Amino acid sequence: MNSKIFAVLLLLAFLSCVLSDQYCPKSSITACKKMNIRNDCCKDDDCTGGSWCCATPCGNFCKYPTDRPGGKRAAGGKSCKTGYVY
């Protein structure tokens, strides 16, 4: 009986980790001079190692997702270019 309860609890813990929502991390920067804005990415495919393309006031950067909401994913699109955008 105890082993069944343990197995169920272990399964629930595993599912909560796998099914938890992921977000771009919130940026600690609130503003950026236009001459310093650059995009390292425009879409998630531009990033490596499971990181996402996240938007910040200083441009788009590859960041690892977190379980805390607050950041935003880069919109990408045809107008997005990598490098300095000024």
UniProtKB/Swiss-Prot annotation:
Residues 1-20 form the signal peptide. Contains 5 disulfide bonds. Disulfide bonds join 24-54, 32-58, 41-53, 42-80, 47-62. The keyword Disulfide bond applies. Its main location: secreted. GO terms for molecular function: toxin activity. Residues 21-66 form the WAP domain. One of its GO terms (cellular component) is extracellular region. Keywords: Antibiotic, Antimicrobial, Disulfide bond, Secreted, Signal, Toxin. Transmembrane segments: none annotated. It is found in: Secreted. Expressed by the venom gland. Belongs to the venom protein 11 family. 01 (wap-1) subfamily. Has antibacterial activity. This is U15-lycotoxin-Ls1d. It comes from Lycosa singoriensis (Wolf spider).
